[in-house]
Regions:
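Short flexible coil/turn linkers enriched for glycine and charged/polar residues
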Residues: 110-112, 121-125, 134, 148, ...
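Conserved active-site neighborhood of the chymotrypsin/trypsin-like protease fold
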Residues: 18-26, 77-79, 84-165, 248, ...
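Residue-level recognition of beta-strand microenvironments
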Residues: 43-46, 87, 119-121, 145, ...
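Hydrophobic beta-strand signal
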Residues: 42, 86, 92, 105, ...
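Active-site loop architecture of trypsin-fold serine endopeptidases
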Residues: 22, 51-53, 101-103, 137, ...
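Glycine-biased strand-turn-strand hairpin within the trypsin-fold
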Residues: 18-91, 99-101, 112, 188, ...
Length: 361
């Protein structure tokens, strides 16, 4: 009897231990992947690209003068990633994934394929919104990219090197949030600001896919990586994602109007402050713009800006012309409703005014 009881206890202990091992394999990471994986998409695109004659490269400038290289449009196939963000089939991705596309096909885990409609694109933030025909799609929960901690888990899912098309499932890599609020300024017409940096491996084809936290919430859209050289394509653990809070705002605007409206009004007319004008006005300021008109009932008037004020700084940057003001606003991707900080010289004093950009009616 004692031997039987001992054997039973051993069996129970073994089974309990085995269950414990199996249970330990299910972590926050695996659960996060399981929750978001059904909503991760492979995006296959046919794009029109300029293709140059191969023999025209690396030639003597003499021949280039008489026989300039010629290009032609050619359909090229490429792939990227995306994430379904609603049960009615809206898909978020990068603009550069579907740029110049003549055909966009979306494949979901399991192999279901859909022709996607491009609802809208935004070149400046490098985001695009697609729509699948149908309903009751699996979709990802969107998190809050303003509530992140450096060092917390970050999981990248997507279609690196077209592997999704082979396995009919996304590839997942895990790392941490390495840094936040990374600003790269104006890059080839695009603005990459407040980017999330991660060491989760991101490779070619991951663009447009989700960066996920350990709760299974999308916190960013994977966009680009740093590589060892311009010829290397593999990840070295330095990848960047567009914060999901920005992506959500852009997607909502694309859903409504198909584009992002960046028109605005300052309610001001200004002229460059020249050396001659500064001497005539007898002011010590030699750099800035002078306000020559303030529109009645405008936000500028409400902010307390007056004719004759000399604006020297906008958002902490020195300015010398109205063009530089517009450049600062554009490169910060500011729109109507956003606030700009003005440093003003008036009657021997330096003042600070906050002007809300108005919409253009």
């Amino acid at each position: 009897m004692a031997r039987i009881i001992s054997s039973l206890l051993f069996a129970i202990s073994f089974l309990t231990g085995q269950w414990g091992v199996d249970e330990s394999r299910h972590t926050a990471i695996t659960r996060a992947i399981e929750s978001v994986e059904p909503a991760v998409a492979s995006i296959s695109v046919v794009q029109l690209r300029d293709v140059y004659n191969s023999f025209s490269r690396g030639r003597d400038p003499f021949f280039d003068f008489f026989f300039p290289e010629r290009s032609r449009k050619k359909e090229v196939r490429s792939s990227g990633s995306g994430v379904v963000i609603s049960p009615d089939g809206y898909v978020m991705t990068n603009f550069h994934v579907i740029e110049n596309a003549t055909e966009v096909m979306v494949t979901l885990p399991g192999g279901e394929e859909y022709e996607a409609e491009i609802i809208g694109t935004d070149f400046i933030t490098d985001l695009a919104l697609l729509k699948l025909r149908g309903r009751n799609f699996p979709y990802a929960t969107l998190g809050d990219s303003d509530d992140l901690i450096i060092g917390e888990w970050a999981i990248a899912l997507g279609n690196p090197f077209g592997l999704f098309d082979i396995s009919k499932q996304p590839t997942a890599t895990a790392g941490i949030i390495s840094a936040m609020d990374m600003d790269f300024g104006f890059q080839s017409g695009k603005i990459y600001k407040d980017m999330i940096q991660t060491d989760a491996a991101i490779n070619r084809g991951n663009s447009g896919g989700p960066l996920v936290n350990s709760l299974g919430e999308v916190i960013g859209i994977n966009t680009f990586i740093y590589t060892a050289s311009q010829f290397a394509e593999g990840s070295i653990g330095i990848g960047f994602a567009i914060p999901i809070n920005l992506a959500k705002d852009i997607a909502e605007e694309l859903k409504v109007s198909g584009k992002v409206d960046r028109s605005f009004s300052t309610g001001l007319s200004v002229e460059r402050l020249t050396e001659e004008v500064a001497e005539y006005l007898d002011v010590p300021i030699r750099q800035g713009v002078i306000v020559v008109e303030v529109e009645k009932s405008s936000n500028a008037q409400k902010a307390g800006v007056k004719v004759g004020d000399i604006i020297t700084d906008v958002n902490g940057q020195k300015i010398r012309s109205s063009r530089e003001i517009l450049k600062i606003i554009k490169e910060s991707d500011l729109r109507s409703g956003n606030k700009i900080k003005l440093k003003i010289y008036r009657d021997g004093k330096t003042l600070t005014k906050y002007l809300i950009l108005a919409s253009v009616k």
